[in-house]
Structures are given as structure tokens and as C-alpha cells.
Amino acid sequence: MTTLMVQGTTSDAGKSTLVTALCRWLLRQGVGVVPFKPQNMALNSAVTADGGEIGRAQAVQAQACRLAPHTDMNPVLLKPNSDTGAQVIIHGRAVTSMNAVAYHDYKATAMQAVLASHQRLSAAYPVVMVEGAGSPAEINLRAGDIANMGFAEAVDCPVILVADINRGGVFAHLVGTLELLSPSEQARVKGFVINRFRGDIALLQPGLDWLEQRTGKPVLGVLPYVTDLHLEAEDGIDVRQGAKLARVLKVIVPVLPRISNHTDFDPLRLHPQVDLQFIGPGQPIPAADLIILPGSKSVRGDLAQLRERGWDKAIERHLRYGGKLIGICGGLQMLGRQVHDPLGLEGAAGSSQGLGLLDYATVLEAEKQLRNVAGTLNLEAAAVAGYEIHAGVTSGPALERPAVQLADGRCDGAVSADGQILATYLHGLFEGSQSCAALLRWAGLEDVQAIDYEALRERDIERLADLVEKHLDTALLRQLCGVA
């Protein structure tokens, strides 16, 4: 059994994408492979079949391996809920919230969970393809590290170091990172991958030759800059726009400080008839057909920010002019009368007034609801599938007009009496072609084009594997993976 780890010189260097690519490339070779990320910090998560929670990048990587997502693929997930603290999720279940100092002391316990998951995966699959987190050279985080070299040392695995040349300074990133590692860690780095290159590779070659001579380590290859991948971004919100048709539906998403699961909007970003805009601090909400309040890891705090930015008044004006409004998960909770946090799960215990647009209230509870669901969107009896990740229990008269009838017999969400507002706990609402088309028609778009988001994602995973085959040293990769 072989473990190979991909680490990056920076956040967003291309670790998740490279691991996804390598997983599908190995699968094409007939090799059983499983993704693994010891520790992930992200507000975008996925629900596993057994009701656990992992980072969405690992769910995509599981798809690349044609496996169902499992909590062992991401045993430690940190979901920030303040500037200094995060909810700690171990093996898919929330155990507590901690500040950075407390978590530093907890790392030894977290490492045991990491090693247990890795042991199970390595016993079941020939290759475990591991993704690091951030940079392995963060001096202040190296003590007790479980995400990068601390893990690699513990399981004795080789490492590939990837850097993003599009940022500039790629040689400084690679050499500097290597220099800051201990001698044993340096020895683990078996080669470099340069990501997001644009231009003539011949012009880069002198630098590659110098890098190999300077470090004594090979460059496994140079991956090109790819502009039209449709895979979820794990960290930042992807605001790239493609070519749009003349008649489009204008959709606005207000970006609040603790926005979660912004990947909900990737299908809209890709839709040729949708003009999706993310609105940040200091920006007014413009005229639109549809406003969507996204999920939030800190609903009461984000409600306060929404009001401070004047967006509550903009939403009221939008509704007066006949616009449509959707609230997803935390957005659903904001649309109600109150949000109560008696246990202080999101900060100081207390209650906040909601926007009062739907007649219900939410009580935040310690037990999180985690499940994959399917059902029917009541707008057009359209099939819908998604997942729930929330800690709130919502009740009130507005729920008597549910947005979704779930296959397990439960109802979800609400639709306002005038039909302008829809609230739901379901993430992934726009990924299904039927539910996406139904919601776009409800928001005012005629002659909606259906897009198969799952097919787009699968096609792009195949494209990534093609890039590995074309641009990387596959003979050395096979050697590192223990594949003949």
C-alpha cells in the first residue's frame, strides 16, 4: 500500500485540483485510489452517506475515484465561526468549538483521529492520495502539525510540492519553502509541479533547469492555466463569468462574513442564461430578478452585518418591486422573525430579530442535522436533491406552505403567501437540472435551457486527468505511487 502527498507553497496553489487529477489518472490505470485530507479548514462541506460532514474538495476527489464520500477521507474539518475560533468536526461529527490556542493543545487528539482514518484507508486501497493544507512552511504552525509535514513524517510518505506560477515568484516559493523545512522533510519532497502556466514553455525552461540544479529535485511537469473548469472552489468565491445570452436572469448573492457552502451557486455561474453577481461590503444591492441569501456559519452575526450594510432595506425594496427572494439554510433562518441561540453556539447566548419576511422562528441547537435528501420542489413538482447541514430547528405558521416535499415524508422550508419568497434548508438546490430550471422559471426566466451540472463536473475531471497524462512525468508518478 502506498501513500503519496501533495503539498503546496501557498493556499490556492492547486493542491485540490492536482489531487483530483491524480486520482482520476490513477483510476484510468486500473489502480484503486482513495483521497485523503488530514485537516481541512473550510466553510464549504459535503454530507456523506452515513450523515457525516467532510470538505467539498474531498467529495469531488471521491467522485474522481468513483467512490462515495466517506468521513475517513477528511477526518478533521474546521469550520470558522469567528475571526479567532472554529467548530471542530472529527470523523464527520461536530465535537466542540475552539479558539486557535485551545485547538493547538487539541492537535494531539486530532492527530489520533487522522492516523486512524489513514490506517483504515491504506488497508482498503492500494494508493492513498493525500492533500495538504496551506503551506508546510508556516513557522508558527509547525509545532504539532497534523496537516502537512507532521502527517507525512508520521506515516513516512513521499511529497510532491506544487506552486502557482500565475501569482509570480514561483521559484522563490519553491526554494523558500524547501529551505524552511527540516532535513528529513526536505528529503520527503520528491519533485515539483508548477501550476497555471501561460505562455511558451521554452521561455520557462532555463528556470526549470536552474531549479533542478539548485535543489537536486526533479520538476515533474508544468500544468497550463485552465480558465473554464467547472469544479467547486473550496476557499474563495469564484466570480468568473462566461459568455451569456442576450436575455438573462440577474441573480444577486450578498456575501456576508461567514458565508458557507457558496458552491451552491456554481451551477448558476455556469448557466448561459444567468448573470450571477456576488455583492460585497460597501456595494449596494442593484436591481435584480432574484436575490439569494446564502448559508452562514454565524447567522446572528451575519444578520447584524446585513443590517449594518443597509441590505435589509434593499431586500425590502426588491420585494416591493416584484423581485423574487430565496433563503438557503442560514438564509432561511434570517428570513424569519427571530433566531435564538440559548446555548451560545455562535457566540454570546441570546436572540436576534430576523428580517420578519416569513412567519417562523429558529432555535439553534447543539445537535447538527446532516443528511442527503431527495424530494419534489412544490413550485412545479420538479425533482430535487440536495443535502442538509444545519444546527437550527425552525417552527412557525409559514412552514404550512412548504417549499419541498421530501421523499422521507418530511416537508422542508416555506413559500410566502404571495409566492415571492422561497426558503429551504437544502444545499445543492441548483445542481439538479429539473429543480434549477423550475427555480429560474419561478424567478422570471422564460425558455430555460437545461444544463447537466454533474456531466460538466465529470467532463472536467476527465480533462484534468488528460493534463496529467500530457504534461507530467507519468513514469515518475507511477514510481512514487508504487505502480508498475
Swiss-Prot record:
So where's the catalytic machinery, residue-wise?
A: C329 (nucleophile), H427
InterPro entries associated with the record: Class_I_gatase-like, CobQ/CobB/MinD/ParA_Nub-bd_dom, CobQ_GATase1, CobQ_N, CobQ_synth, GATase_3, P-loop_NTPase
- Name a biological process GO annotation: cobalamin biosynthetic process
Pathway where it operates: Cofactor biosynthesis; adenosylcobalamin biosynthesis
What SUPFAM superfamilies is this protein classified in? Class I glutamine amidotransferase-like (SSF52317), P-loop containing nucleoside triphosphate hydrolases (SSF52540)
Question: Which terms does the record give in the GO molecular function aspect?
Answer: ABC-type vitamin B12 transporter activity; catalytic activity
Tell me which residues make up the GATase cobBQ-type domain. 248-435
UniProt entry keywords in alphabetical sequence: Cobalamin biosynthesis, Glutamine amidotransferase
Q: Which Pfam families match?
A: CbiA, GATase_3
Q: What does this protein do?
A: Catalyzes amidations at positions B, D, E, and G on adenosylcobyrinic A,C-diamide. NH(2) groups are provided by glutamine, and one molecule of ATP is hydrogenolyzed for each amidation.
Q: Which family does it belong to?
A: Belongs to the CobB/CobQ family. CobQ subfamily.
Q: What is this protein called?
A: Cobyric acid synthase
Q: Which organism is it from?
A: Pseudomonas putida (strain GB-1)
